[in-house]
């Protein structure tokens, strides 16, 4: 039996290796025990799954196990996006949600994501308890289950369709009339994932012309990771370049919690820029007011927007769970990460790629400009900022030397004085000219993730080289 370990987005593993039916049963029982210990079991649990192999089978087994210990399941009838599951959890005031997803990981992975009563990703104190309970049970038959038929008769199993309630919320947050009146054609790419029938349907119902690609169920995700990053959506970019009628391309990942945005000429727009553009748009055009939250790895272009509008930015460790806390507490207008996660005030404290895409569509429709033009306009007001991330692979010797290297940082990086060291997640060095470097060690492989940001594009490569030299030198 392999050790159960929860990461930033739950427990994930490769099919038939770590992710087995026996291990799933143990984790589900651990969640059930956790809910009983917290006195929440009577509120019931929302169960959902993405488009991967056996998602429905694992979910039904989960419902049988929960019923065996008296916990009701609200079972999503088809593969369902993560933000929709979070929305349903909050709407029903359930005890939590169990979501079978590995998000943007390749097809041979699966996972369990547990969301507590707050609706956001579980915080470490919750996942640590579940993890401890699960590992104590490995190899033991500790669960009992009852059939779904008997569970339904006892009021412990109910099949649900959460889509319409979610759509109702989106219609309060997004100006669909503005999108429709613009007359623009939008290309939509759910990457064969659980976002099928969401972006396309709600836009079409609003009267928007939609061009679809990769919109049928495929557990192999077309042979690529279901991640809407530039390198995995060449076909989508090609479609937009070849169809002059398309003004905007909107993509979501395997469970639709992340987004990918393509401009009218086929240019991929980095999530860092989308977050800053939407923050500016919500204040300047929608007349809203509030602070932003971003992870330590996310661009300070968000900070420049905040300074321009006289509001603040809250910096968090990597992981949307920390941003979700601010959304739950109604402390921010928008929160996001450079890894394409975003949500806003009044919505779920969970990444929502569907909402992010729709807000971008609204922004383009209202502003009547391309995203490249909008970014240029933003730069003219707050200044240019350029960001890049690379991975640095380590030898065993270099990996062993890292703790001492970070414990004794240099006074300078190149010719720039280090003015502040931030260690809430990794080691971030703020430099005197406003540029910065962040080093984050992977928890699963001998890799350091290097993030670099400068105020002009020409110096970005130099700063990356200096960061690489610091690690490898």
Which residues are covered by each model-predicted region?
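Buried hydrophobic positions in well-ordered alpha/beta secondary-structure cores of metabolic enzymes
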Residues: 9, 47, 85, 98, ...
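Proline/glycine-rich low-complexity loops and linkers
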Residues: 77, 132-165, 264-336, 342-344
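Short glycine-rich phosphate-binding loop at a beta-alpha junction
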Residues: 41-50, 185-188, 290-296, 333
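Glycine-rich phosphate-binding loop of actin/hexokinase-like ATP-binding domains
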Residues: 98, 111-130, 257-284, 336, ...
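An N-terminal, well-structured beta->alpha segment
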Residues: 1-69, 95, 151-184
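Gly/Ser/Thr-enriched, mixed-charge loops and adjacent short helices
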Residues: 1, 110-244
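Phosphate-binding and adjacent anionic-ligand microenvironments
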Residues: 245-248, 288-473
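N-terminal small/polar loop signature for handling phosphorylated ligands or for N-terminal nucleophile
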Residues: 33, 41, 45-109, 201-262
């Amino acid at each position: 039996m392999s050790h159960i370990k929860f990461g930033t987005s739950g427990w994930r593993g490769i099919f038939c290796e770590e992710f087995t039916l026996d291990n799933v049963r143990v984790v589900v029982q651990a969640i059930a025990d956790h809910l009983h210990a917290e006195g929440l079991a009577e509120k019931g649990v929302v169960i959902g799954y993405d488009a991967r192999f056996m998602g429905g089978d694992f979910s039904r087994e989960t419902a049988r196990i929960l019923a065996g210990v008296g916990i009701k399941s609200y079972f999503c009838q088809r593969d369902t996006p993560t933000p929709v599951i979070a929305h349903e959890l909050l709407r029903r005031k359930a005890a939590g949600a169990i979501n079978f997803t590995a998000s943007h990981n390749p097809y041979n992975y699966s996972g369990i994501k547990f969301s507590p009563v707050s609706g956001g990703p579980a915080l470490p104190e919750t996942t640590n308890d579940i993890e401890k309970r699960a590992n104590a049970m490995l190899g033991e038959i500790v669960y009992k289950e009852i059939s779904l038929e008997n569970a339904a008769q006892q009021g412990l199993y109910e099949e649900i369709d959460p889509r319409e309630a979610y759509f109702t919320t989106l219609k309060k947050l997004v100006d669909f009339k503005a999108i429709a009146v613009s007359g623009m054609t939008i290309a939509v790419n759910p990457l064969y994932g659980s976002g099928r029938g969401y972006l396309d349907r709600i836009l079409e119902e609003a009267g928007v012309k939609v061009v679809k690609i990769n919109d049928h169920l495929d557990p192999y995700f077309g042979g690529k990771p279901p991640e809407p990053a530039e390198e995995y959506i060449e076909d989508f970019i090609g479609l937009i370049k070849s169809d002059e009628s398309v003004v905007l391309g909107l993509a979501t990942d395997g469970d639709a919690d992340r987004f990918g945005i393509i401009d009218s000429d086929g240019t991929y727009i980095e999530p860092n820029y989308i977050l800053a553009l939407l923050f500016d748009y919500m204040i300047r055009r929608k007349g809203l007011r509030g602070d932003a939250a971003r992870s330590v790895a996310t661009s300070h272009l968000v900070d420049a927007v905040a300074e321009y509008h006289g509001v603040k930015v809250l910096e968090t460790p990597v992981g949307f769970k920390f941003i979700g806390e601010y959304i739950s507490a109604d402390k921010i207008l928008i929160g996001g990460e450079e890894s394409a996660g975003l949500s806003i005030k009044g919505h779920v404290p969970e990444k929502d790629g569907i909402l992010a895409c729709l807000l971008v569509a609204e922004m383009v429709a209202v502003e009547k400009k391309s995203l490249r033009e909008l970014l240029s306009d933003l730069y003219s007001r707050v200044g240019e900022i350029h960001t890049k991330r690379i991975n640095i692979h380590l030898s065993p010797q270099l990996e062993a030397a890292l703790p001492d290297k970070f414990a004794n940082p240099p006074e300078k990086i190149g010719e720039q004085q280090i003015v502040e060291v931030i260690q809430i997640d990794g080691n971030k060095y703020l430099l005197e000219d406003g540029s910065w470097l962040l080093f984050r060690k992977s928890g699963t492989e001998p890799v350091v993730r290097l993030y670099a940001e400068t105020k002009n594009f020409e110096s970005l490569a130099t700063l990356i080289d200096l960061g690489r030299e610091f690690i490898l030198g």
